[in-house]
UniProtKB/Swiss-Prot annotation:
Residues 1-32 form a transit peptide. Residues 137-146 have a biased composition (Basic and acidic residues). Residues 111-158 are annotated as: Disordered. Residues 147-158 have a biased composition (Acidic residues). The gene is AL1. Disruption phenotype: Leaf albino phenotype, reduced root length, and partial seedling lethality. Residues 119-136 have a biased composition (Basic residues). Pfam families: RAP (PF08373). This is RAP domain-containing protein, chloroplastic. The lineage of its organism: Eukaryota, Viridiplantae, Streptophyta, Embryophyta, Tracheophyta.
Amino acid sequence: MEAALLRPPPLAARGGVSIAIAFSVSRLPSAAAAAAAGKPRKLAPPACRCRATPQWQLDFLGAEADTEADGGDDDDDLDLDLSLPAETNDWCVRARRSALRSIEARGLSPSLQRMVASPKKKNKKKKSKKTNLKQKKAAEPKPPRDTDDDEDDEEEADDDLEALLAGGGELDDLELRVAQFADGMFDEKRQRNREQFIQTLSAFSPAAPSNRSQEVSLNRSIVEARTADEVLALTAEVVAAVAKGLSPSPLTPLNIATALHRIAKNMEAVSMLQTHRLGFARSRDMSMLVGLAMVALPECSPQGVSNISWALSKIGGDLLYLPEMDRIAQVAITKVDSFNAQNVANVAGSFASMRHSAPDLISALTRRAAELVYTFKEQELAQFLWGCASLNECPYPLLDALDTACRDAPSFDCHLHDTVPGMWQSSDKEASSLKNSSNAYALNFTRDQIGNIAWSYAVLGQMDRPFFSGIWKTLSQFEERKISDQYREDMMFVSQVYLANQSLKLEYPHLDMCLRGDLEENLTKTGRSKRFNQKMTSSFQKEVGRLLCSTGHEWNKEYTIDGYTVDAVLVDEKLAFEIDGPSHFSRNLGTPLGHTAFKRRYIAAAGWNLVSLSHQEWENLEGEFEQLEYLRRILGFDAE
């Protein structure tokens, strides 16, 4: 009889659902006792206690266990001695059941319930008072949580969550559950660390009185430091001293910008590996220094904003400092009228190297660059044009100003500057700058600068402008013997000039400006060498390429079209397929970068039907079947 009661009842005759109900056998009256009392043998309702398993326990056990027990009513006053659902063949449910019994034996069920069960909504009668209570709750410090009152804990967590969301914050389910571990220990620790971090940052107020001698001494020590670690150690020492009561702080906005600039410069001096830079950037002291820089950014000079932007691009590359670059863009727009040509070029170059799109900032920098057109040095002009082209932002005001300068001058002359005979290197000190003179404009470019400008005009589609014509003519001064496939600088120059020349042939044949003779032959020969055409196939490309074979067509992979390598093509149909990974798009907005837009435009102009697949689209697909159907749809194979 007892064994029969513990087994789940059979299924209902007409599709009914089996409900497992656990009985408390100890309360059943025995047959002898019933006979002695002279009463008939039957199961009286008070003699059997039947209750459903709480919903939070079913949630913990999983969906498999949920079908084996009655969901019942949610009971706030939990009986932890209730029997669990009937045995199941699912080993996961059995393992969770054993863990649940162990947790109950240790008296930790309330903590587990707070982790598993979602916070309950508290019904409030008056809406007018609800808003005031939440605002007051957010302003006042939270009292310690009472672990003895589970319901109060749930209501308090609900208030905290609502206050956070009302303040513009977001909290996902995972963060909410982690915050409730160990009676909120991790949440409290996070809040303490956050308050300590804010308190440390507030100690460095730009409006505080200054100590000139300490500031100058610290600045000298930062400049004289030979390694990035030495610079960071100096700033960490000052931060610790300020936390202990040093006032005023010698770590002014100028010294903060100088420290970041010297850290990046020392990294560049030793060619530090990217992995080491990223590890350095994630250290506690470095995070504190970057946080101080963001706080002091509005008080920095235009040169300080430029130095911080350049430093972050060298330290974090395109992997870190996304919100920091957004803040730099906001502050730089307010200070752009005070920027000089160097500041304009450095800020644009740093955003381009980090693949961080900022259209409003680039637009403001372009207007400022057009005003400063006569003060640009050759390197600054090449860097700014390259930055705009890399982000696919055309600087129309600056291009118009350059064309106007060329037309207004009686003689416009561009020269090729070679610092060391027989070696092609960039010059650190330029011999001249673009000056506002009524007689002539003399530009003394290096080979790499001409390559950057030529590539920028090709990417922007502005090769029919007078300024580009004057720059392009200087290529006739090159000596072909100085181009080799053994140097990275040579390969970069060849790739830029070769693509610009091919664009002139294909998109601007009416200009009749393409290179001819030995120079074109040497560029083409170097561009087709094995060292120049080294290919790297990502796992994303391999995954998509494998599914391409399932479309029923024979694809030619890694096909070359006039210097461009296309991932896969159908030659007979003139169909080109490009697989664009994250490096083809800006990291924050997901817009195509300049080199991607130029490649698409060039392949389409060459007569190919180009179809592109971005990694964002691919990540939204689930399963190979859906991926294959998507490929067939974008390639136009649905009708087959």
